[in-house]
Amino acid sequence: MKDVRSLTELVFNHIQQMPRSDKRKLIAIGGAPASGKSTLASQIQMRLEEEGYPCGLVPMDGFHLDNEILVERGLLDRKGAPETFDIAGFVNLINRLSAEKELTVPLFDRGRDCVIEDAGRIKAQHQHVIIEGNYLFLNDGVWKDLHSCWNLSVFISPPQNILKERLIQRWLDNGLDETAAKARALVNDIPNGKLILSKINRQIIDVWLE
């Protein structure tokens, strides 16, 4: 896989080729857990702003259901799976991005493992907004309703061995021992990534990064 700088330039070039209009453009970046979505999204945001294009950012992680709700539903061990997100709230926010100039968005605090409401802002000058998340292109259920919202669809797909290494390291960095870190990666995160690849609507992807 190319380095993040090369990937950023590739996506930036696609953005520059998009038809000009006064309407806000929604750029969707999807991929499996630990695929590099967040890093790529932040780099593209910076690149756009360097060129004078104000850009907002909406991470789908801000729509994780609260742990208390997941416990009640018996889903805490599956956190990160499609059914553990507030999909109705997420779809509502995506629709608001096209209808409203300014709004706040929730952000996920990984260290505290919780969502912080209204922690992010989309401003009127943000003519480009990047949305990044696991299930943006899932060809299943309500997720399909999102496909027509995207002006540019980007999917990042590193090799499985790289995903595994990154996921284990992520859990180690969050304080788990090696056994627990491997279990979290193998039992939940990697299956979620395989689900994404098996149910993705490839026909709507404009840029596929490997």
Name each model-derived stretch:
Residues 34:
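Walker A (P-loop) phosphate-binding loop of P-loop NTPases
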Residues 40:
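Hydrophobic positions on the alpha1 helix immediately C-terminal to the Walker A/P-loop
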Residues 37:
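Conserved lysine of the Walker
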Residues 116-118, 141-144, 169-210:
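Small-molecule kinase domains that catalyze NTP-dependent phosphoryl transfer to phosphate-bearing small molecules
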Residues 51-68:
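Short beta-strand-centered segment that lines the nucleotide-binding/catalytic pocket of NTP-utilizing
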Residues 56, 68-112:
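Conserved nucleotide-sensing/catalytic segment adjacent to the nucleotide-binding pocket
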Residues 112-170:
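ATP-dependent NMP and nucleoside kinases share a basic, alpha-helical "lid"
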Residues 1-28:
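Extreme N-terminal, non-catalytic leader segments
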